[in-house]
Amino acid sequence: MDIVGGQNLRQMWDDLAGVYGDKTALIFESCEGIVRQFSYASLNEEINRTANLFYSLGIRKGDRVALHLDNCPEFIFCWFGLAKIGAIMVPINARLLGEESAWILQNSQVSLLVTSAQFYPMYREIRQDNSTPLNHICLIGEQLPADDGVSHFTQLQSRQSTTLCYTPALSTDDTAEILFTSGTTSRPKGVVITHYNLRFAGYYSAWQIALRDDDVYMTVMPAFHIDCQCTAAMPAFSAGSTFVLLEKYSARAFWDQVRKYQATVTECIPMMIRTLMVQPAAPTDRQHHLREVMFYLNLSEQEKDDFTERFGVRLLTSYGMTETIVGIIGDRPGDKRRWPSIGRVGFSYEAEIRDDQNRPLPAGEIGEICIKGIPGKTIFKEYYMQPEATARALEPEGWLHTGDSGYQDEDGYFYFVDRRCNMIKRGGENVSCVELENIISAHPKIQDIVVVGIKDAIRDEAIKAFIVLNEGETLSEAEFFSFCENNMAKFKVPSFMEIRTDLPRNCSGKIIKKNLK
């Protein structure tokens, strides 16, 4: 089913500006509460100015430009400005340090970077090391340095025409972005995303949440992440909705912001749900316009019930990854939900559970979740410059091996068990970290929990739990292990526990387990 019809991102924005004109497209709120607002017409003009800025700096079709930015309107300008001239965006996780950022610059062969003043000292050192092709930095902000090879984004952009001066031929098969995966267990891989991928994501995700042009989609997810781009921004713009982008997440401010912008749709990760739940209850908890909350794994049933009861919202489960572009398995508005199912496969996709020999498994049996799509259209095109990794993950017929364990029931509902790399092998038994985390998170004193496997000379791996307690609480080892013994099989009970003040996370809230082992 071709729902894109040959429309690239340049044509998309020209059409949106013509159709929606003065309607509000983007609202941005900074951490200081400063609000910037753009109509569809004015946002398209800013995108065109930015495209011309890149052209003035020598960027042409096929060139790669890195963005290292926190959430800001300039990210949107650059993302689509590059797409309009056929150039390729390489977003860099704003939490990465120098060595990791330099590795991405080197592996994507980026010569131009757009970043903000706070990150400039790190990139000045990277340039001085001459370890990457980076030769020019375009800075966003005020009181910027006048160093060689540095230009000021706002000054350059404001001088540009709102009419594109460079319009190379574009195809929906052209690469629009190389998005490096989070790399929680190893070096990240560059996921190649096309114009078609992004256009499809807009239509698909808008369908998934029944988005309309009178909706307001608010997100705090980082703009450099696939969730913000393909589950929030693209569907909001594709539907002619208003997209509200917040600079940073604040549990204290979240519901006030939902009410302020009259948001009807938002997205949450487990960390957000847990921190929202520890905020003091208020009479206004249910006073909002939210009809759907897009939700990403993992959450216990008790946490889900407590959240929906307190705030009067529905959690719309969505399962996917960078390589699938969108949530290819999920719930749908109005459909009956079958918790803890992650939902059913969406249109344009197929899904199977496969065994270790790549054979389909019947309902009820646990195996690897495999997804069939069209590379470069409904799933990613390839890993950038990594043909062997691409071949391991993606079969010629379009079957993607997710590396996740799960099963399906007789009615076609899928159930997530764990990341395959998250399974602990303990004395001949496979133990799911997610299962243990869901059980332990029910302890009333525990705010956050992660379980990892550590080497054990006798049983292959031992189980260790890292715990963050609710404010003011204490928890003895005896109390912890007693709780575990009463709620899980003996072979699943952790051997060790460690209380910490926080847990290391990547940009999407996923815990970086390699930092704990």
From Swiss-Prot:
Key words, A-Z: Ligase
Cystine connections: none
Enzyme class: ligase
Listed GO MF terms: carnitine-CoA ligase activity; crotonobetaine-CoA ligase activity; medium-chain fatty acid-CoA ligase activity
InterPro entries noted in UniProt: AMP-bd_C, AMP-bd_C_sf, AMP-binding_CS, AMP-dep_synth/lig_dom, ANL_N_sf, CaiC
Reactions catalysed, as given in the entry: 4-(trimethylamino)butanoate + ATP + CoA = 4-(trimethylamino)butanoyl-CoA + AMP + diphosphate; crotonobetaine + ATP + CoA = crotonobetainyl-CoA + AMP + diphosphate; (R)-carnitine + ATP + CoA = (R)-carnitinyl-CoA + AMP + diphosphate
Metabolic or biological pathway, per its Swiss-Prot or TrEMBL entry: Amine and polyamine metabolism; carnitine metabolism
Pfam families: AMP-binding (PF00501), AMP-binding_C (PF13193)
One annotated GO biological process: fatty acid metabolic process
SUPFAM superfamilies for the chain: Acetyl-CoA synthetase-like
EC number: 6.2.1.48
Superkingdom of origin organism: Bacteria
NCBIfam families in UniProt: PRK08008.1
Function, as annotated: Catalyzes the transfer of CoA to carnitine, generating the initial carnitinyl-CoA needed for the CaiB reaction cycle. Also has activity toward crotonobetaine and gamma-butyrobetaine.
Family membership noted in the UniProt record: Belongs to the ATP-dependent AMP-binding enzyme family.
Record HAMAP family: CaiC
Name this polypeptide is given: Crotonobetaine/carnitine--CoA ligase
Species whose genome carries this gene: Salmonella agona (strain SL483)
Gene: caiC
